Every structure is written in C-alpha cells, then in structure tokens.
C-alpha cells in the first residue's frame, strides 16, 4: 500500500465524524443558517490567503519543474477558481462574497490550523511535512463531496448541493499531485520519520473538523471569558 493510502486509511474515522457533524449535515439538507455561512466564508477567506502563501513556500522545496509549474497553477486556482464555491454560499446568504469578507474574522480554530501548517513549512526542509499538513484540506473536501453524491439526504432542491458538486471534482488534480510527491519522498524515509508525517497529516484532519464546527458555533476569541448574568 502506498504511503498516501495509509494516511487516508488512518484518517477515515475523522472524516466520518466530520460528515456526521452539524455543518455537513445542515449543508446536505440545505437548512444551514446564514450566520454560519457568513462566519465560514469570512474565516475561509483568511485561511485560503495563507494557504496560497504556503504554496509559495513549497516551491523552493520542489525538485521537479513540473511540480513547480503545478503549484503556480494552484496559486491561481486558490485566487480565482475556488471563489466559485464561495459564491454559491454567498448567494444562499443573499449577499455578495466580496461584501461578506470585508469584515475579517480570525477565529481560534483557523488560527491554530494555519500555524500548524506554517510550522511544518518553516521548521522542516523536507517538503513532505508541509504537504502532509496541507493535503487534508483538498482531500477531505473531495471525500465529503463525493460521499454526498450518493447520499439520499443531499437535497437537490437546495443550492447547497452545488457546493458539494463543485468539490466532488475540482480537488482531484491537487490531490493526485500531493499523493505523487508524498509517495516519492516517503520512499527514502525511515519508519519513525513516516510516523511523524502521519501525525502531521492527522493533526490537520482534526483541524479541518474544528474549522467546520467553528462556523456552526460562530467561534470567536473570548479574551475576557464568558459573562454569566
């Protein structure tokens, strides 16, 4: 079994939990609230900006010009292509995407996730660690979306179905490239090192779950604690 497949197998329980959590279930039914969608879009805009910067940090670590070219193309996709998925949700809210993200949010779950990825990029020379931190994002979105396509709970009468349709196909290229790079780099690594990479991957899967849940709870920093009247 290739290394990437071992990672996916280990991540299955987490992905199952994400699918059953409120965010995805409400998206499937089309009953998700506008406040949750706004919070998600604002947080995801901040997240994707940093995710794009991480692609730029990966480029110097690449040995293949084909990989460099693909990462440059992915930067363009993050800036332009994925906005299509955001526009779907913004239309459901009834506001333009640009208007929604004018108000920035940086919730704890997004903060911790981004810092986890940056730590790998800056502290590890081997690109496999950075990729292992980044790869769960496209992989989990694709897995959730593909699973939705055969789920009777997917409400085709609601526009949220279009969001699942988008991610059911649009992540395949980056998933394949990340897989190929990780599998190649894994060949020359020890079992102990690969266990560390696996840990990085699974931590990002947990961060993905917390990110979705963040939207449902309208998570924010509570520096003064909660006040109980």
Swiss-Prot record:
Gene Ontology MF term list: thiaminase activity
EC number: 3.5.99.2
Recorded GO CC terms: cytosol
GO annotation terms (biological process): thiamine biosynthetic process; thiamine diphosphate biosynthetic process
InterPro entries for this protein: Haem_Oase-like_multi-hlx, Thiaminase-2/PQQC, Thiaminase_II, Thiamine_Salvage_TenA
Top-level class of the enzyme under EC nomenclature: hydrolase
Catalytic site positions: 137 (nucleophile), 208 (proton donor)
Catalyzed reactions: 4-amino-5-aminomethyl-2-methylpyrimidine + H2O = 4-amino-5-hydroxymethyl-2-methylpyrimidine + NH4(+); thiamine + H2O = 5-(2-hydroxyethyl)-4-methylthiazole + 4-amino-5-hydroxymethyl-2-methylpyrimidine + H(+)
Span of the signal peptide: none
Alphabetized UniProt keyword annotations: Hydrolase, Thiamine biosynthesis
Pathway(s) where this gene product acts: Cofactor biosynthesis; thiamine diphosphate biosynthesis
Annotated residues for binding of substrate: 44, 141, 167
Cited Pfam families: TENA_THI-4
Site features described as Increases nucleophilicity of active site Cys, chain residue numbers: 47
Assembly: Homotetramer.
Function: Catalyzes an amino-pyrimidine hydrolysis reaction at the C5' of the pyrimidine moiety of thiamine compounds, a reaction that is part of a thiamine salvage pathway. Thus, catalyzes the conversion of 4-amino-5-aminomethyl-2-methylpyrimidine to 4-amino-5-hydroxymethyl-2-methylpyrimidine (HMP). Is also able to catalyze the hydrolytic cleavage of thiamine; however, this thiaminase activity may not be physiologically relevant. Therefore, is probably involved in the regeneration of the thiamine pyrimidine from thiamine degraded products present in the environment, rather than in thiamine degradation.
NCBIfam families: salvage_TenA
Family listed: Belongs to the TenA family.
Protein name per its UniProtKB record: Aminopyrimidine aminohydrolase
Species of the source: Staphylococcus aureus (strain NCTC 8325 / PS 47)
